Amino acid sequence: MADRGPQPWRARTTGALIGTACVALVATGGVVSSGNGKQAHHLMALGPHNIDPGADPVTTTLPPSTTTTTTTTTTTTLPPLEVLSISPAQGAEGVASGMPVTVVLSGPPRAGAPMPALVPAAKGQWTVSGSTLTFTPSFGYAPWSTEHIVVPEALAGPESSSFHVAGAPLLRVQQLLAELRYLPLDYGPTPGVSGLAKAAPIAALVSPRTLPGTFTWRFSTTPASLRALWTPGKESVVTTGALMHFEADENLPEGGPIDPQLWAALKEAVASRATDPVAYDYLMVSEALPEQLVVWRNGADLYKTPVNTGVPGAWTETGTYPVYARFWTTTMIGTDVDGYHYDVPNVPWVAYFNGGDAVHGYWRSSYGYPQSNGCVELPVDNAQVVWSMDPIGTLVNVSA
């Protein structure tokens, strides 16, 4: 092909790209390569009317717009919690039934973390204050039990501790005896009204925890000698007699310590709302002449009889004692103050209350002054009447 010499540069394009290409060229100037290998220099002020439709096309490739999104995930690993302390301490003895349990952690528990468990289970509620967890029992732990505190692994464990619960408090036993009418007293938040009369919740009644309230005498005529023997929460012959009476009714060993067997029987009786099937009797023996015995029952002097007490050297010991053994008839063997050995069979209506001293029937020509070897002797027929009112645990008061 003949050299045509310098030719105006011709480009071919279409549509909207025309304006775009032209603007680009104008803005750039300089050298542009055409499809025929020729170069055009110093293009100036090219507009759409300068484009030769027969020229080779110029292909312009624009790079795509690319957006890259980067997501960063940060994982924070919290250190595991540790148990700093547990109260009551491991192996603690004699822990009160209502004592709270406290678990102190190295930090606040995580949301949704399980609370420690008590085994055997006890009703109550856990509360959280910072890193301290506190369990407050609703009705107390079972007396004489061993409680285990188990901290689960999901909280801060696994870790465990245990403590030993004290026996039933004497005051609580007295409250239950009052509920069951084995005492001449009522117990409750309202003076003169027992928990049973108010239909108190059974869970509260059988709880080993002492309940708030007051003891009040059931009878305004309660003898002064009986009132003087009673102190709430303290050992006394009044409590001993009531327990012996209850044990006899329940066919339990009489006069033993307060133990799990006795406590279980008390709870069962309260839960079934059983009460003492007999009245409250109190026997008062006066050694003032003429000697007599008075049976005080449920607020009134119900029965009186002349009696004989011990002769000098074999005095009937003064004080108050519970009846601990009873016989329709028995043989009495001993030695009197003169050294005479006696062996008397078929002594009737016998109720022992202080060692070898007993209230019983005996055949005498007269009564009302000291004649016995320490016992309280009654006319036989009268002794039968009194025997019907002195069950096991009945208190016998002997005064000078």
Residue ranges and their predicted role:
Residues 83-92, 119-121, 130-137, 266-282, ...:
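N-terminal post-signal-peptidase region of extra-cytosolic proteins
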Residues 106, 110, 152-156, 178-183, ...:
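Sec-exported extracytoplasmic/periplasmic mature domains
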Residues 98, 102, 146-148, 170-174, ...:
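Extracytoplasmic/secreted envelope proteins and their assembly/folding machinery
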Residues 1-11:
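Terminal targeting segments of Actinobacterial cell-envelope proteins
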Residues 12-32, 37-65, 74-172, 185-191, ...:
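Acidic, low-complexity Ser/Thr/Gly/Pro-rich repeat segments typical of extracellular/periplasmic
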Residues 278, 315-318, 327, 334-400:
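Exported/periplasmic cell-wall-interacting domains
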Residues 160-168, 175-268:
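Short acidic, glycine/serine/threonine-rich helix-capping segments at coil-helix boundaries
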Residues 248-256, 260-318:
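Cell wall/extracellular polymer interaction/catalysis modules
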